[in-house]
């Protein structure tokens, strides 16, 4: 089975990693139209990468996303902010919670998250193709 993931951002990488790690026979390929991977991750949180937020409930977490709150509540019931924290912890990326509830890598450097996502993708044999625009 060949799985194509369009976009080399955080969602694309996470989807590709999840697919490759749960479907050992899948050939997973990320297609990124530019020559830069995870560019929004690099600038998120002023270059520190705001990974997630420390919210008590799924409803509180979904409220941070004004469009599509109901859809997000359903998605967050499957994989939420604590799932994200646990996912990075399992990969030895330590996170910290700031007073306003934003969660960052302890390094205060988005490169920590970028490296983790790229390393995890390569560990699961995800192929990454830059400058590969999808036109139709």
Question: Where do the protein language model's features map onto the residues?
Answer:
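Short N-terminal binding/cap micro-motifs at the start of the first secondary-structure element
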Residues: 12-14, 37-40
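N-terminal Rossmann-like FAD-binding beta1-loop-alpha1 element of flavoenzymes
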Residues: 2-30
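A conserved short coil-to-beta-strand element within the FAD-binding core of flavoproteins
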Residues: 130-136
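General beta-strand structural signal in soluble alpha/beta enzymes
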Residues: 30, 96-97, 128-130
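Glycine-rich active-site loop/strand segments that organize a redox cofactor
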Residues: 46-97
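Short beta-strand to alpha-helix junction loop
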Residues: 72-82, 99-119, 129
């Amino acid at each position: 089975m060949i799985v194509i993931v369009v976009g080399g951002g955080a969602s694309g990488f996470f989807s590709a990693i999840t697919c490759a790690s749960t479907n050992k026979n899948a050939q997973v390929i990320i297609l990124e139209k530019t020559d830069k991977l995870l560019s929004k991750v690099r600038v998120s949180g002023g270059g520190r990468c705001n990974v997630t937020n420390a919210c008590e409930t799924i409803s509180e977490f979904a409220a941070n996303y004004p469009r599509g709150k109901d859809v997000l509540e359903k998605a967050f019931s499957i994989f939420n902010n604590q799932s994200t924290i646990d996912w990075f912890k399992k990969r030895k990326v330590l996170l910290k919670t700031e007073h306003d509830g934003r969660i960052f890598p302890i390094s205060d450097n988005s490169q920590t998250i970028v490296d983790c996502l790229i390393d995890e993708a390569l560990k699961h044999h995800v192929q990454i193709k830059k400058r590969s625009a999808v036109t139709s």
